[in-house]
Structures are given as structure tokens and as C-alpha cells.
Curated annotation (Swiss-Prot):
Pfam family, one: Hydrophob_seed
Natural source organism: Solanum lycopersicum
InterPro entries, A to Z: Bifun_inhib/LTP/seed_sf (IPR036312), Hydrophob_seed_dom (IPR027923), Plant_LTP/defense-related (IPR051636)
Bias-annotated ranges (Pro residues): 25-42, 51-81, 89-144
Matches recorded under SUPFAM superfamilies: Bifunctional inhibitor/lipid-transfer protein/seed storage 2S albumin
Region (Disordered): 11-144
Designated name of the protein: 36.4 kDa proline-rich protein
Organism lineage: Eukaryota, Viridiplantae, Streptophyta, Embryophyta, Tracheophyta
Amino acid sequence: MHVLIACPYCPYPPSTPKHPKLPPKVKPPSTQPPHVKPPSTPKHPKDPPHVKPPSTPKQPPYVKPPTTPKHPPHVKPPSTPKHPKHPPQKPCPPPSHHGPKPPIVKPPHVPRPPIVHPPPIVSPPSTPKPPKTPPFTPKPPSPIPPIVSPPIVYPPITPTPPIVHPPVTPKPPSPTPPIVSPPIVYPPITPTPPVVSPPIIPTPPIVSPPFVPNPPVVIPPPYVPSPPVVTPPIVPTPPTPCPPPPPPPAIIPSPPAQPTCPIDALKLGACVDVLGGLIHIGIGGSAKQTCCPLLGGLVDLDAAICLCTTIRLKLLNINIILPIALQVLIDDCGKYPPKDFKCPST
């Protein structure tokens, strides 16, 4: 506020109108997006300062030891010449005035002996002393300032995804082939066939019994029946005028006909020999090659009966060889005799 002092001679100052107050300026809201700093790429770490390795002190210069002066040369003293020895002077006789003067006889000239110098003095060889090296005093190590390396900034580690291995399928075990040892082939034994005498059939008495037909032979299904045994009809003889005949004997029915081998059983001798050799080594390929061609034209039951007949002719143990023979028939030759087959009794 202005303080006005009333003064009679000072007019009132004119009142200046005040400027109207302007409304405050309102800044519009800034629509600029916020300033985003780009991600700072880590600076490569500076190479650490190269530190020179401590220098090894140089060796001190080689100081030659003082050389000892050689001995002064030996100076020979001057040789003093020897005085020649003068012969003693003979006293001269007094001169005689009356005779001629005798000749003056001079002493013979004696040559001077040569001057012989003494041998030179040989001094021993001087051995130089080894040089003395001063003791090595290493320099004190200079303090090395600590090496301050800038911190190494590693980039962020991004984990690698785990390695998924395919499932391991185990290999199927390889079947090992059975070890088949070659069968021992024995040479065929051809024994002499026993002399078979025909059975002696006694002639029955001539009786006129009533005709009894033979019962039919029961044959299994795969068996091809042999032709029935046709017996000739019994022709009764006319009665003789005899006394009354005795009572007729009991009628015994004839047994059924035994099946026989339709081929020569001796042809299967080689097959039975091979089967006899297979008791200890097991059934092999030789039995198939030997027996199957011989039994090819026979039916199942005939083949088994022929083997039984040949085993009996060979006088072998039928209880041991028959199971082997039946197994060869079924497995190798494709023949199927009746189940629980047994050789017919003779």
C-alpha cells in the first residue's frame, strides 16, 4: 500500500486504473509419449593394463683382476774377460859380448778358451689366479601397484532348452542258430537175412463144419485196406459109408490177418542203420536224406510197419529205435502213423 502524506500544496496523484487480472494460463495436457531410454548395451570390458614383468637386474660388469707384472728379465752380469796367464819369464843370462846373441824364443801361442756362458735360469710357469667376482646383491623388489581391473559385465544368461533324446528302443536279441554237429554216418551193415522157414501148418482133418465167414478186418481211416483174404469154399466130401464120425472138435476162429510191408524190407536197411546211429547224437539231416526217398511211395501206416519189419530183421532193440523212427516219419518225411502206434507182433 502507498502511504500518502497530506500536503496542502501537493495535489493528489492521479489514480491509475489497475489492469484487469487475466485468467491463469492453463497448459494443455502433454500428449507426448514418455521418453523411453533404449536398453544400454553393456560396454566391452576394457583390457586390463599391461603390466611389465619385473626386470631381472643385469649382471655387473666383469671386472678383470689386476694383472700381476711378470718377473723382470734376468740380466746377466757383464762377463769380465780373464787375463791370460803369462808364462814366467826366465831370467836372462848376462849378455856375453863374445858370442852371438841367442835367439829369442817366444812362448808358444796359447789360444784363448771360448767364453762359456752359464745356462739361462728357467722360471716356473706362472699360474694366474682366478678373478674374484664381487658378491651379487639383488635389488630390493619394487612394490607393484595393485591391478584394479574393471568389473566384468556378463550378458544375461538365457537358459538353453533341455535336449530331448528320442526313446532308446533296445535291439531285439539276435537268435543264435542251433549248433548242429554233423551226424556220424556209419557204413550200412548188411547182415545175412535169417533163413525163415515157412510155418508148418498141419493138415486139419477133413470135417464138414458149417461155413463160418471170417470177421472183417477193422482198418483205421487213412489205411488203405489190403484185399480181403479169399479162402476157397469148403467143398464137403461125400459121406463115406463109415461108422458114425466122432464128435466134431471145437471150432477155433482164425486170427485176423496181420498187416505186412508191401515192399522188400531189406531196402530200408540203410535207413535203419542211420536211425541206430542217431541214438547218441540226435536226429540230423542224414536221416531225412536217407529214409524219406525210400518211404516216399508208402502211406503212413505202411511206412511205419516196414520200419518195424526192418528193425526186427536187423536184430536191433525195437523199443529204443522205434520212437526215433516215428519222429523222423512225422518231422522230416511228412508221414503220420496212427497215434500210440506199436509194431505188430509176429
